[in-house]
């Protein structure tokens, strides 16, 4: 099994060294494809990309995919700057980010690669918080509810220790929009999701939120909280409730790709094709949820049409040039 390294675990995020060599997984590197595609972005999406690269590297030892995990917002900044070919994101691109790309004449393609459920969890020893609605969550994360008793009069009068990702993360943006109605999050913030999990496990009054796979990996140390929808139905995050969107904090996960990279970088276009043909298997292996199969098929059809169109355009330009040279 190939081992993956995290380099530079600073506040700016770690970088995954991916697909750099064929490894003890039986990979013979039998592809003629050579080159590199660079990405950065969501730490939530990073485990999926890692799983994809375990498979990719088996047959593409000379086609490298490097992907950082600086956070969705930081990834989009690099994408806008033209420093990377693709950006991993745990939220849709914002209007202001779209505008900055437009101002730089950078066109992009959006690919939905999986689904996630932002999971709210409390300490394993918490025996009273089983479910919350969004208003209660908002009270906790706005700082208006200082103690559990402020949330529910039947709960203990003990100070809540709320922890949140910081604003560089798409998970933060999602929570801010879906729960806070864009009101400020007033809680301890951390760039490292594993540190958030650790904080909740160590503090009996702790509460935090993160991607579903972080809960799955730590379910023996955490207690998940059911979230009530607008009709008051409390639902826990599972693969089924996340995929059918019955879980109130379900969300899609994305890869955004620079169109120029899709046209000019064969490694980039082949990797995205590979991602879509995987049909969410890597996402499932990483602890997330595959999108409906038709989602991958329609996106793959669109990608192939885009590549074919540009190939025909390039062929025409080549033929025109040859004709000019003969004159």
Swiss-Prot record:
Keywords: Cell membrane, Lipoprotein, Membrane, Palmitate, Phosphate transport, Signal, Transport. It is a lipid-anchor. It holds the Pfam family PBP_like_2. A lipid is attached at residue 21 (S-diacylglycerol cysteine). PROSITE patterns: PROKAR_LIPOPROTEIN (PS51257). CDD domains: PBP2_phosphate_like_2. GO terms for cellular component: plasma membrane. SUPFAM superfamilies: Periplasmic binding protein-like II (SSF53850). GO terms for biological process: phosphate ion transport. It is found in: Cell membrane. InterPro entries: PBP_domain, Phos-bd, Phosphate_ABC_transporter. Gene3D superfamilies: Periplasmic binding protein-like II. Residues 1-20 form the signal peptide. A lipid is attached at residue 21 (N-palmitoyl cysteine). It comes from the Bacteria. PANTHER family: PERIPLASMIC PHOSPHATE BINDING COMPONENT OF PHOSPHATE ABC TRANSPORTER (PTHR30570), PHOSPHATE-BINDING PROTEIN PSTS (PTHR30570:SF1). The complex is composed of two ATP-binding proteins (PstB), two transmembrane proteins (PstC and PstA) and a solute-binding protein (PstS). Part of the ABC transporter complex PstSACB involved in phosphate import. Belongs to the PstS family. This is Phosphate-binding protein PstS. The gene is pstS.
């Amino acid at each position: 099994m190939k081992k993956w390294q995290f380099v530079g675990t600073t506040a700016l995020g770690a970088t995954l060294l991916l697909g750099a060599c064929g490894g003890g997984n039986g990979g013979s590197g039998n592809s003629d494809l050579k080159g590199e595609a660079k990405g950065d972005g969501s730490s939530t999406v990073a485990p999926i990309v890692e799983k994809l690269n375990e498979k990719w590297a088996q047959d593409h030892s000379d086609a490298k995919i490097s992907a950082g995990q600086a956070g969705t917002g930081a990834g989009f900044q690099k994408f806008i700057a033209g420093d990377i070919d693709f950006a991993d994101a745990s939220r849709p691109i914002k209007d202001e980010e779209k505008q900055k790309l437009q101002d730089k004449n950078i066109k992009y393609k959006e690919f939905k690669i999986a689904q996630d459920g932002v999971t709210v969890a409390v300490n394993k020893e918490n025996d009273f918080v089983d479910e919350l609605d969004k208003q209660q969550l908002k009270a906790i994360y706005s700082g208006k509810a200082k103690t559990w008793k402020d949330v529910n009069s039947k709960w203990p009068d003990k100070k809540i220790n709320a922890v949140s990702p910081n604003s560089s993360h798409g998970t933060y943006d999602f929570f801010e929009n879906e729960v806070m109605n864009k009101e400020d999050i007033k809680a301890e913030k951390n760039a490292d999701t594993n540190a958030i999990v650790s904080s909740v496990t160590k503090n009996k009054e702790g509460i935090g939120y993160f991607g579903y796979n972080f809960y799955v990996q730590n379910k023996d140390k955490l207690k998940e909280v059911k979230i009530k929808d607008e009709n008051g139905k409390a639902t826990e995050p599972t693969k089924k409730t996340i995929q059918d969107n019955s879980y109130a904090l379900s969300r899609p996960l994305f890869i955004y790709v620079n169109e120029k990279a899709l046209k000019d970088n064969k490694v980039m276009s082949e990797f995205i094709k590979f991602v879509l043909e995987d049909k969410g298997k890597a996402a499932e292996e990483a602890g997330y949820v595959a999108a409906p199969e038709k989602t991958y098929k329609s996106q793959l059809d669109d990608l192939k049409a885009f590549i074919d169109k540009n190939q025909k355009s390039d062929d025409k330009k080549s033929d025109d040039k040859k004709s000019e040279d003969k004159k």
